[in-house]
């Protein structure tokens, strides 16, 4: 694992014109900005046309609040960006550094987005074949074509495969992969039981294979994760532990919370 961590420090993505985008999607900015402009217009109309001061003050407060919100999420987006604060790259380093893996066989990433973690895994283990699956909905500016383009520019296209998939029902037989990884994906699957999603990901992991599944594991969504970790141990899984990635990747819980990932935890173990 120390050697793996050394490799992570020497891999820097996004230096060949790749586009890894941001999980803070453009539509979010458009919506907040649009509402802010509307509120500002209504404030002006309330003061100077309708002469209703109470409404003017209300819309002015809403406008200011939305401007502050827009500044905040712009800062968050910049911190996560591969061309900015590179926080997400640090998260990826932490995830892979916890895998006790010799580099042979196949790796699956559940929810690959723009392909960044899949590509980093391929660069870390030159003998491995890495498969990234994603639903690629309309909310984010990600696609299979974007992933393939990024992999080609990083020089790992021959070992990376990207395909459409659903985390609730993976289109692979039991015990298909030597490694399963994921990063901030499961909480986006609306209406799903988070622990069942984790078990579905572990279903396709080979006996003896390792996993590192990172997410914002709020108790109201995930339930008792310490209990779930014990459940895995009772099922025969080994070396199961929960890593506090809010601390390890972000440096402090307060900083992670400011970036809306204050409950970030990594489930690690061996099947």
Kindly give the residue locations of the regions a language model identified.
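Class I SAM-dependent methyltransferase Rossmann-like catalytic core
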Residues: 20-29, 70-91
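Conserved class I S-adenosyl-L-methionine
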Residues: 103-113, 131
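Conserved SAM-binding loop of SAM-dependent methyltransferases across substrates and taxa
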Residues: 114-126
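Helix-to-beta-strand junctions that scaffold the AdoMet/dcAdoMet cofactor pocket
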Residues: 125, 189-191, 205-207
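A short glycine-rich, Lys/Arg-flanked "PGG" loop and its adjoining helix->strand segment in the class I
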Residues: 195-207
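Conserved beta-strand signature within the Rossmann-like core of class I S-adenosyl-L-methionine
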Residues: 208-215
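Core SAM-dependent methyltransferase catalytic element
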Residues: 236, 249-271
